[in-house]
Amino acid sequence: MKTNNNICDVCRRREAFFSRPYSGEKLCRKCFAESIEGKVRTTIAKYQMLNFDDKIAVAVSGGKDSVSLLHILAKIEQNYPKASFVAVTVDEGIKGYRDEALEIAAENCEKLGVKHHVVSFKKLYGFTLDKIVKSLKQKGEDELTPCAYCGVLRRKALNMAARKVKADKLATAHTLDDETQTILLNIFHGDALRIAREKPITDEVHPKLVQRIKPFCEVPEKETALYAYIRKIKFQSVPCPYAAEALRNDIRVMLNRIEEKHAGTKFTIFKSIEKVRPALEAMAKKEGLRECSECGEPTTEKICKTCQMLRQIR
């Protein structure tokens, strides 16, 4: 008797739609989507990311990762009547790119009945990212890429937005790919001890810092895209025009090439770091936080990195 080898390994009824190279699992559309939702629930429980009555701010850019996380957290939140969540979006001011993302983020929030808050670089800092890039080029200052400036400014903007809405947690859609890229990026920059701070859930070290959680930290980026496709979630597919200039992009390409040949490499990197993280934390000096003398936000220096960058731009 001939057996059908293309049947879902979970339900044993429906035709398989996707095969996970790192585990060998074959899954139908329904079981695949449920496996992603289950993985998020497991990750939240594993790292004790949430309390039953938390107010969560979800960072929503409009891309596949953030809108997928928004939909999954909305589903989970239904089981916790005392919990609540809002979406926060940062408008960096990237012409021809961010406008579409803002519309998509707003559309997803409206569909889910989630309040949507938007903060902009222009309003917070007086500059759009486009203006920053133009200003730096005119000055001949190209030591840092646009992504380096955007990363620092965006991180501060998200924290301020989450604090403004009185959130207990700030959920970001960093995937397994993002986490492994960051690990290698820190090593390439000679800052291996920084890995100790880049955890799935951050330590609360200052009253002005909203604790960050990463429910997608063990989900590959490819699978968040597939989840959005299966659940028919609208997202922006066009990449940021500045992304190609960053070292992170080179690391992404390298990791994807290795993963293609050696499935499971990204998980191995992530799990290895999780094992040695306690030792790294013991080695890393606990940096005391103070308030920036210019903007009042938490920083390890007298003047925070954002204000240092804005000085350079001005």
Predicted regions mapped to residue ranges:
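Flexible helical/loop "lid" subdomain adjacent to adenine-nucleotide binding pockets
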Residues: A45, K55, K169, T180-T224, ...
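ATP-dependent adenylation/nucleotidyltransferase module used to activate substrates
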Residues: M1-L185, H189-R197, E218-R231, C304
